[in-house]
Amino acid sequence: MSNSFCVVYKGSDTDINNIQRDFDGKGEALSNGYLFIEQNGHYQKCEMERGTAYLIGSLYNRTFLIGLAGVWEGEAYLANDAELLALLFTRLGANALALAEGDFCFFIDEPNGELTVITESRGFSPVHVVQGKKAWMTNSLKLVTAAEGEGALWFEEEALVCQSLMRADTYTPVKNAQRLKPGAVHVLTHDSEGYSFVESRTLTTPASNQLLALPREPLLALIDRYLNAPLEDLAPRFDTVGIPLSGGLDSSLVTALASRHFKKLNTYSIGTELSNEFEFSQQVADALGTHHQMKILSETEVINGIIESIYYNEIFDGLSAEIQSGLFNVYRQAQGQVSCMLTGYGSDLLFGGILKPGAQYDNPNQLLAEQVYRTRWTGEFATHGASCYGIDIRHPFWSHSLISLCHALHPDYKIFDNEVKNILREYADSLQLLPKDIVWRKKIGIHEGSSVNQAFANVLGSTVDNYQTKSRFTYRVYQAFLRGRLSITDVTPSQLKDLIKKD
């Protein structure tokens, strides 16, 4: 299962055939090009007045969108996802699609050859436009290389890419590519000589930074509503879900909430020979009655998780790849056992988990907002990797409603009295489902409790906090995959050693 796709402007059967040498999938003719969709990819299409609408991927908040469209059209209750977005687009305009959540790309193939493209806003399905021998639109750059060969993509110098900088959410290290701005409408068109270009505008204005000082009880009620909403949408489809469970607040809270919605929970904990959090995860599993599995990862498995995250999610940032390693190892462990997985990922950026208890911050909300924004280009929320393991990955914290609620929330709810994530701990405590020592346990990073960060450093011969070295290695692997010089099916230790030593 994969939602990878590409559109080639003025393409031909030959382009599709070239891709099919490396990737299973099918091609479909468009008004002025071809669409390629990987095998078993989730896609739907429908006819509308402007042309043919395509939805690649899935909607997460379908129930909400049906209720919205149903105000005007009863047919919304019978519509598939593509028809639902087309209906909202027709009735309310492109801006209405800012309300849609999911790992999707929606586009309209118009008879004049233009493509009107709507990108989702949370980094679940990053989309690029590439100017190679031909013009491409894709959420998987590997497909362009498969079609045009090793020289299809041109890369920025390593020194420029591996800097600890804040970047625009359109950033990509591929010089002849443009990452389409998330949460925007784009028109891919061409000039009088046939050269393609992109016109873009955002679907919404930036959120207000005015301090939100909600009273405690209404705030707790909103957190409860917004965290449960995605679980309520999933419950009719899945009896069993999987959860990566560290025993920290976020994964434990998601497990507790899921225990109210699903018949069976499979929980997974990972560690290394250096350290693990099995004591805490087992405590939560016992309290909630989950089917719990624990696994010690070797350094080879840690590196394999990093390599897979680079390949599938096209990550070039060392920290993001390191964090994803644990998740990819859980995907492998859970493959065939569950088809849906829930995580606590993203909570730290909303509720202050990355802040240091007792530290003084002039504007903690600004610091958190910068890190939320950063996820729009890192690839860490991309769903390709989980999909390749047959898993529908969901992050209940990463919703429009909860992100907006927390954006300007009073900092005292996030860091106060030598503690962080205060309001989330209060909420978890109010459920009376988790042991108090879990609710008030000190924060440890997802990659730190299992010492994945140290294992990565050991393989590179570096120090645990040297993320420039980690990013250099990650970017080298990223380039090797996107040039077609490495294959995910037969990456060898000697190839990786060459990339580590290359300086």
Curated annotation (Swiss-Prot):
Consequence recorded when altering E380Q: Reduces catalytic efficiency
Residue ranges of every copy of the Asparagine synthetase domain listed in the record: 228-443
EC number: 6.3.3.6
Entry binding sites for substrate: G346, Q371, R374
Molecular-function GO term, any one: asparagine synthase (glutamine-hydrolyzing) activity
GO cellular component, one term: cytosol
Active site: Y345, E380
EC class of the enzyme, as a word: ligase
pH effect on activity, per entry: Optimum pH is 8.5.
Source organism superkingdom: Bacteria
Chain segments annotated as coiled-coil in the UniProt record: none
Residues the entry annotates as binding ATP: 244-251, 270, 344-348, 421, 444-446
Transmembrane segments: none
Pathway assignment: Antibiotic biosynthesis; carbapenem biosynthesis
One of the GO BP terms on file: antibiotic biosynthetic process
Catalytic activity annotation: (2S,5S)-5-carboxymethylproline + ATP = (3S,5S)-carbapenam-3-caboxylate + AMP + diphosphate + H(+)
Keywords: Antibiotic biosynthesis, ATP-binding, Ligase, Nucleotide-binding
Pfam family of the protein (one): CarA_N
Self-association state and partner proteins as the record states: Homotetramer.
Main function: Involved in the biosynthesis of carbapenam-3-carboxylate, a beta-lactam antibiotic of the carbapenem class. Catalyzes the ATP-dependent formation of (3S,5S)-carbapenam-3-carboxylate from (2S,5S)-5-carboxymethylproline.
Protein name per Swiss-Prot or TrEMBL: Carbapenam-3-carboxylate synthase
Species annotation: Pectobacterium carotovorum subsp. carotovorum (Erwinia carotovora subsp. carotovora)
Higher taxonomy: Bacteria, Pseudomonadati, Pseudomonadota, Gammaproteobacteria, Enterobacterales
Gene label: carA
